Amino acid sequence: MTNIRKTHPLMKIVNNAFIDLPTPSNISSWWNFGSLLGICLVLQILTGLFLAMHYSSDTTTAFSSVTHICRDVNYGWIIRYMHANGASMFFICLFMHVGRGLYYGSYNYLETWNIGVILLFTVMATAFVGYVLPWGQMSFWGATVITNLLSAIPYIGTNLVEWIWGGFSVDKATLTGFFAFPFILPFIIMALAMIHLLFLHETGSNNPTGIPSDTDKIPFHPYYTIKDILGALILILFLMLLVLFTPDLLGDPDNYTPANPLNTPPHIKPEWYFLFAYAILRSIPNKLGGVLALVLSILILILMPLLHMSKQRSMMFRPFSQCLFWILVADLLTLTWIGGQPVEHPFTIIGQLASILYFFIILVLMPITSMIENNLLKW
């Protein structure tokens, strides 16, 4: 008799995706981040759901309802901080996952990669609207500044901003709207993640060498399920260390001050995971130019398959490209640091140089280096 998991219509899908899935035998821990992102998503949906049960999306009570969750609700503080720090873990895993894709040439699976970029945009949008909900100073002013960027769009910009605000400033309608988005967006993310997996399983996983591994595949379970469980335990360990010892380490102290439209904080900045994009936005003096650079800093990922000039897929055997890749990582860390600094000398010029370098590495240096490496192969 055939095993039920191979015959039952629903279990067959699960079986083909997580149990009998043929997987390359040499994929490293860099391939763990997909499952970790799944865990983060489920964690965020669950903690978010429990927070929503006690949250009030009214400008007069939003801030105090979050305080109420932390003080009066059973284990409310741990749910709140797991949600806040879970977002940070989500983005750490996301950046590692995208970095892995860039390093090992996974972007050559076009459909999977493009859905992944759409997923990245959706997660960033969800994190942004979610950050507005506690209605602290940084929530309010972050919402005002970032939504106001849309006014740079010619002709329809101003109308678009007022439509998102639900009036002529960030107010009750904005908060209610922004409470509706983090409710629906995670489910859209879940659907996109399923499509992402569907496309991935059409081609099979890439591997560190970038060489087709059809001759050497092993079943996903038990080899990689046990590996994913270890990754999950490490993720939960780091998350709980953050939550239980330094829950406010990655937050902004200004967000413990209730939102006040009459008092602008001295330095408006988003959460740490948006700082690199914020630094690129600020490095351009023109409003529309800054917005375009901000969008392009992420959208540039779509171009990666077109910019791939190497005869080899992975960077495993390309030392010059490896060097460039790590310079790019250092540049992104520099941008993240600059995004959190005030707009003054020398931070402004460092931010501008780092922004130019970011685009220059991806659009110019990487393709040229790949072509040089191709020629070196002939020797």
Swiss-Prot record:
Transmembrane segments: 33-53, 77-98, 113-133, 178-198, 226-246, 288-308, 320-340, 347-367
Family: Belongs to the cytochrome b family.
Record-listed heme b b562 binding positions: 83
Gene name in the database record: MT-CYB
PANTHER family to which the protein is assigned, alphabetical: CYTOCHROME B (PTHR19271:SF16)
Organism annotation: Blastocerus dichotomus (Marsh deer)
The record's free-text note on cofactor binding: Binds 2 heme b groups non-covalently.
UniProt-annotated location(s): Mitochondrion inner membrane
Entry's Gene Ontology BP terms: mitochondrial electron transport, ubiquinol to cytochrome c
Single GO cellular component term: mitochondrial inner membrane
List of residues binding a ubiquinone: 201
Keyword Metal-binding: yes
SUPFAM superfamilies given in the database record: a domain/subunit of cytochrome bc1 complex (Ubiquinol-cytochrome c reductase), Transmembrane di-heme cytochromes
Primary localisation category: mitochondrion
Annotated residues for binding of heme b b566: 97, 196
Membrane topology: Multi-pass membrane protein
One MF term in the entry's GO annotations: metal ion binding
Keywords: Electron transport, Heme, Iron, Membrane, Metal-binding, Mitochondrion, Mitochondrion inner membrane, Respiratory chain, Transmembrane, Transmembrane helix, Transport, Ubiquinone
Quaternary data: The cytochrome bc1 complex contains 11 subunits: 3 respiratory subunits (MT-CYB, CYC1 and UQCRFS1), 2 core proteins (UQCRC1 and UQCRC2) and 6 low-molecular weight proteins (UQCRH/QCR6, UQCRB/QCR7, UQCRQ/QCR8, UQCR10/QCR9, UQCR11/QCR10 and a cleavage product of UQCRFS1). This cytochrome bc1 complex then forms a dimer.
Protein's name in the database: Cytochrome b
Function: Component of the ubiquinol-cytochrome c reductase complex (complex III or cytochrome b-c1 complex) that is part of the mitochondrial respiratory chain. The b-c1 complex mediates electron transfer from ubiquinol to cytochrome c. Contributes to the generation of a proton gradient across the mitochondrial membrane that is then used for ATP synthesis.
Native organism taxonomy: Eukaryota, Metazoa, Chordata, Craniata, Vertebrata
Cofactor(s) the record lists: heme b
Any one Pfam family match given in the protein's UniProt record, by short name: Cytochrom_B_C
Note: Heme 1 (or BL or b562) is low-potential and absorbs at about 562 nm, and heme 2 (or BH or b566) is high-potential and absorbs at about 566 nm.
